[in-house]
């Protein structure tokens, strides 16, 4: 998990990794002037099931359903299969200008994920040591 502990309990049952509050605070400190975003700390399937039809947003006393994402930060789990599953959820819910940032891309096959996302109009725009950014250009 994020703290280096095995993902299996002593009795052999799988253990769900935690997202410690310190990681959340570190993430949020990188966006001091961006107040208009929501950070959901949910497991993938929990998020997909809850918000597959959109996220309810309340603005000026009105409820709107947001089902198009402008920015998605992928930070774990770090397997090609799971990251691709996440990307495939968000790709059809994106628009031109949407940016996907993948953390720790060297721990999975980022080239395969980028190749699949080409078919959704994404192109790799920046590649760093630990992060990779793709942007939807068409």
Name the predicted role of every residue range.
Residues 1-138:
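S-adenosylmethionine/decaboxylated-SAM
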């Amino acid at each position: 998990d994020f703290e280096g502990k095995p993902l299996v309990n002593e009795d052999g049952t799988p253990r769900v990794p935690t997202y410690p509050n310190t990681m959340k605070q570190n993430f949020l400190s990188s966006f001091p002037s961006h107040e208009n975003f929501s950070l959901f700390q949910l497991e993938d399937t929990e998020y997909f099931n809850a918000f597959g039809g959109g996220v309810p947003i309340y603005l000026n006393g009105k409820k709107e359903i947001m089902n198009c994402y402008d920015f998605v930060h992928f930070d774990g789990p770090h397997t090609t299969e799971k990251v691709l599953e996440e990307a495939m959820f968000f790709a059809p819910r994106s628009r031109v200008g949407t940016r996907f940032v993948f953390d720790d891309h060297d721990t999975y096959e980022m080239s395969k994920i980028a190749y699949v996302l080409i078919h959704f109009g994404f192109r790799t725009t920046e590649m760093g040591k630990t992060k990779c950014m793709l942007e939807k250009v068409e």
